[in-house]
Amino acid sequence: MGKRLTDCITSQYIGAANRLGSKSARRRIVAYVESYDDIFFWRSILTRFENEERYFEVLLPSRLEHLERGKKAAIMSMIATGGVGRNMIACVDADYDYVAQGATYSSKTILDNPYIFHSYAYAIENMQCYAPSLHNVCVAVTLNDAQKFDFEAFLADFSTAIFPLFVWNVWSYRNATERRFTISDFIRSIEMGTISPENASAAIAQLRRRVAHKVKMLQSQHPGAKESYLSVKNSLRELGIMPSETYLYIQGHHLFDKVVVPLMKKVCNTLVRERERDISRQSVHATQQRNELSCYTSSVGSVEYSLRRNVGYVASEQYRRIVGDLERFLNDTSDAITSTQNHNPSPSST
C-alpha cells in the first residue's frame, strides 16, 4: 500500500515549507503529542513561546489508515525514522523514562534526543493533580472557598509512605533481574481502596504497614541489592525527586482515578451541601430559595473536567524544567537559523 503524504512529513519537510513562504511569514513548528488529552497541556506551555517570528501547531501523529496513540507506537516510529528536528518536535509523557535514566531503549531515546520534550512527572494527570492547586480546583467546582481537606499534607504523607517501594520499582527497571518488580506490582502494592477525608489518616497508616511488608519481601528476594538500592535512592534525589513529591512520578491514571478524584468528589460534595444549606438559611421565602438553589446548582462544575483543565502546575518545578528545555531548544534553533541565513545571503546582497 502506498504511503500518504502526511505519513512522509518530517522536520525537513516543514522547514522546506517554511522557506517557501514570504520572509515576513512566521516559522511553523509542529509539535506532535500522544493523545487528545495532551493537546491542551502542551498548547498551554507552547503558547508562551509564540511571537511574530514563530508559532506552534499541536497535532496527533497519523499512521496508515488509523490514528495510533502513545509514544511506543506512532511517535517512537516517527523518532526512529528521523522525523523530528528543528521544525518538528515530539512532546510526550515521561512515564518511567525520566527516572530510568537511559536504562531502557525508550528512556535513552527520549532523554538523548534534543527534539523530544517530556513532562518530567509520569504523565499530565500527575501535573493536573499538583497538590498546591487542588484547593483552587475545589473552589472552581463548588464556588465555595472553605478548606475542608488538606490535599497538600495528604499527598505529602501518601508520597512519603510509598517512596521506599517506589525506589524498589525504579531499581527493578534500572537493574535487569529475574524477579522483576513491575509498575503493575507497585500499583497493586499501594492500592488504598475506598478513601475519604474521614479515613485518610487511617488509610495512610495502613499503607505504610503494607509498604513496609512489601519492602521486607523485596529485601529478602534481593539480599545483595542494598548498595544498588541506595545508589538509586540517591540518584532520584539528585534528579529532584523528593520523597514528599513521589505522587508526581507514579502511574498517572492511578493517581488521578483512584486517589485524587475520589477524595475530591467527597470534599466537593461536602462543600456543595454546605453552600446549599447557607442558601436555604439565608433565603427570605421559598421562591427565592428555589431560584438561588437552581442558579447555584447550574453553576456547580464537574470534578473530572475541572481537574483536566487545571493549570495550577505552572507553579511546579516540573513545569519550570519543561519551559527551560523549550527555551534552550528555541535559542539553539534560532542561532542555527540565523547562522544559515548569514551564510546564504540573498542575491541582492551579493
Task: Place the predicted regions along the sequence by residue.
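Acidic, divalent-metal-binding catalytic cores of TOPRIM
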Residues: 1-350
